[in-house]
Swiss-Prot record:
Residues 254-270 have a biased composition (Basic residues). PROSITE patterns: RIBOSOMAL_L2 (PS00467). It comes from Ehrlichia canis (strain Jake). This is Large ribosomal subunit protein uL2. The lineage of its organism: Bacteria, Pseudomonadati, Pseudomonadota, Alphaproteobacteria, Rickettsiales. Disulfide bonds: none annotated. The keyword Acyltransferase does not apply.
Length: 276
């Protein structure tokens, strides 16, 4: 794919950098693989805001993605690559030899007409899915399972990956794109390759309206609020907040570790993320 640097014809286009989607499918998604998605705007069933800065956004259809890849031994041809409004990665529509269709997260380099397959003994090619114990050390993978058969949960967003570092009995060591090194059961499945849309990190939306299309509402600074609304609020004139940065609920922020020290999964993490 790539990115588009737009000319400054208007103020909202100045500095705008968008994704080039010219190589993606321009029609509607596969009808049998979509479902309606009702946006809740960050509210719960009582109408109370539980997640701030969430809005309605543009209407979307949810694409049903096959994260399990449990159709073993049946080859599938890539019909097309599509944009998915529900995630940063692109998706690929597969047509299996037995007539079934499914969506998968598209790895970088996958193109229309490629053949992919899931199962042991598959070639180490982008889009093929194998157990971690069957993948050579040093290979980049994505859509990695944490529990065998439950479907991939690690490395699913644009440009992410996990690199297989070593094998140790029933476990393998994976280095994630965040720098974290983690133990995973060798019977878990993973898909070969790095997730597509590597240029997503270079996108600059250019105007507030594009954020609203994505369902993101404005974020108000605490020092601009009243004392009732935020610990940094109030004061005469402009103030600095008067204390170390905290959330609206008084929890230290900007670098404060929030992970529980006694979490059961700590024993599987050999090195924490470089990004905190």
């Amino acid at each position: 794919m790539g990115i588009k640097n737009l000319n400054s014809v208007t103020a909202s286009l100045r500095g705008t950098v968008l994704l080039d989607k010219s190589m993606l499918w321009k029609g509607k998604p596969e009808k049998s693989l979509v479902s309606y998605k009702i946006s809740c705007g960050g509210r719960n069933s009582r109408g109370v805001i539980t997640v701030r800065h969430r809005g309605r956004g543009h209407k979307r259809l949810y694409r049903i993605i096959d994260f399990k890849r449990n159709k073993v031994g049946v080859s599938a041809t890539v019909e097309r690559l599509e944009y998915d409004p529900n995630r940063t990665a692109f998706i690929a529509l597969l047509s299996y030899d037995d007539g079934e269709k499914s969506y998968i997260i598209a790895p970088n380099g996958l193109k229309k007409g490629d053949v992919v397959i899931s199962g042991e003994g598959s070639d180490i090619l982008p889009g093929n899915c194998l157990m971690l114990k069957s993948i050579p050390v040093g290979t980049f993978v994505h859509n990695v399972e944490l529990r065998p058969g439950n479907g991939g949960v690690i490395a699913r967003s644009a440009g992410t990956y996990a690199q297989l570092m070593s094998k140790d009995g029933v476990y393998v060591l994976l280095r994630l794109s965040s720098g974290e090194i983690r133990k995973v059961l060798s019977d878990c499945r993973a898909t070969i390759g790095i997730v597509s849309n590597l240029d997503n990190q270079n996108v600059k939306l250019g105007k507030a309206g594009r954020n609203r299309w994505l369902g993101i509402r404005p974020t108000v600074r605490g020092v601009a609020m009243n004392p009732i609304d935020h610990p940094h609020g109030g004061g005469e004139g402009k103030t600095s907040g008067g204390r170390n940065p905290v959330t609206p609920w008084g929890v230290p922020t900007k670098g404060k570790k929030t992970r529980k020290r006694n979490k059961s999964s700590n024993k599987y993490i050999k090195r924490v993320s470089d990004k905190g």
